[in-house]
From Swiss-Prot:
Its EC number is 2.7.1.148. It catalyses: 4-CDP-2-C-methyl-D-erythritol + ATP = 4-CDP-2-C-methyl-D-erythritol 2-phosphate + ADP + H(+). The active site is at 8, 136. Coiled coil: none annotated. This is 4-diphosphocytidyl-2-C-methyl-D-erythritol kinase. NCBIfam families: ispE.
Length: 274
C-alpha cells in the first residue's frame, strides 16, 4: 500500500510571546502544497524484526529508529501489536526547509497503517497520536488550510483557498538551526493578525503577512533574503520564507508562466500549482 505525503508552507508566522516553560507562542497558517514524498508499506509476517526501512531519493541522516515514519509505526504497534512491515520511503521534500516533510511522512504513516490494518481510528484519534510525534504532525491528518496557535499545536480550520495560484519553492544549500532562528526574535503582536491579514487580497499580503523569523534569519544567511527579493523581481504577488527556513516560496498569478531562473548549484527548486 502506498501514499504520497505532501509538504506545507507557512502563510505568515508571528511569534507572539515567550512562555514560562521557555517555548514560544505563535500564530501561523499551514497550507498544503503538492510537493510530495512517496511512502509504501509491505507486511512481512515471517520477518525476524518488527520493521525494515529502505530510503531513496534525498539523503536522510541519522539512525532508522529516529525516523518519524518508524516512530509512527512503533507508536501504533505498542497498542495494536501490528504485523512486521517493510517501509519504503522516497524523499523528494527537502529536510531542514520549513516544509514539514518529516512531520508529513509521520502523519501519512499513521493514516496508512490505520487503513492497511483496519484499525478504525477516527481523524480525532489520529491527530492525538500525531501530536505526540511533533507539533505540526497533526496538521497533516486532515491536511487542509489551518490556523495554528499555541506552540503550533492548537488548530482551527480556515476558509482559505489559493486554488489556481502557481508556486515556486526555492531552498538553498543552507541549514538554519532552531537556535539561530530564535536568536534575535522579539515576541510581539503584529499590527495585522495572521487571521486578519489572510482575509485581504493576496496582492496586499506583502506588507501585512509577515514571517517574524525572517528578521532573525536573513542577516545570518543573506542568500535566503536574496531569494525572496528575486522572487518579487520575477513577478511573485507574495513571497515568504516558510517556517524557520531555509526554503522560500513565491506565489504567482494563475495566468502566465513561471520564470526560468538559474538559482545556482545545490539549490532545490519546485514548481507547482495550488
Amino acid at each position: 500500500m502506498i501514499t504520497f505525503p505532501n509538504a506545507k508552507i507557512n502563510l505568515g508566522l508571528s511569534i507572539t510571546e515567550k512562555r514560562p516553560d521557555g517555548y514560544h507562542n505563535l500564530e501561523t497558517v499551514f497550507y498544503p502544497v503538492a510537493l510530495e514524498d512517496a511512502l509504501e508499506i509491505r507486511t512481512s509476517p515471517e520477518a525476524d524484526k518488527k520493521f525494515s526501512l529502505h530510503q531513496y531519493g534525498m539523503e536522510i541522516s541519522g539512525n532508522p529508529e529516529d525516523n518519524l515514519v518508524v516512530k509512527a509505526y512503533l507508536l501504533l504497534d505498542k497498542e495494536f501489536h501490528l504485523c512486521p512491515i517493510e517501509i519504503h520511503l522516497y524523499k523528494h521534500i527537502p529536510s531542514g526547509a520549513g516544509l514539514g516533510g518529516g512531520s508529513s511522512d509521520a502523519a501519512f504513516m499513521l493514516k496508512l497503517l490505520n487503513e492497511h490494518f483496519q484499525l478504525n481510528l477516527s481523524e480525532d484519534q489520529l491527530e492525538i497520536y500525531a501530536a505526540t510525534l511533533g507539533a505540526d504532525c497533526a496538521f497533516f491528518i486532515r491536511n487542509a488550510p489551518t490556523f495554528a496557535e499555541g506552540v503550533g499545536n492548537i488548530f482551527s480550520p480556515i476558509p482559505l483557498s489559493l486554488k489556481g495560484y502557481q508556486i515556486l519553492i526555492i531552498k538553498p544549500d543552507v541549514f538554519v538551526s532552531t537556535r539561530e532562528a530564535f536568536a534575535n526574535i522579539h515576541p510581539h503582536h503584529p499590527e495585522y493578525s495572521i487571521k486578519e491579514a489572510i482575509k485581504r487580497p493576496v496582492n496586499e499580503w506583502k506588507e501585512i503577512l509577515i514571517n517574524d523569523f525572517e528578521d532573525s534569519v536573513f542577516p545570518q544567511h543573506p542568500v535566503i533574503g536574496e531569494i525572496k527579493a528575486e522572487l518579487y523581481r520575477q513577478g511573485a504577488v507574495y513571497a515568504s520564507m516558510s517556517g524557520s527556513g531555509s526554503s522560500v516560496y513565491g506565489l504567482f498569478e494563475p495566468e502566465g508562466t513561471l520564470p526560468e531562473t538559474d538559482w545556482g548549484t545545490n539549490v532545490f527548486c519546485f514548481k507547482g500549482r495550488l
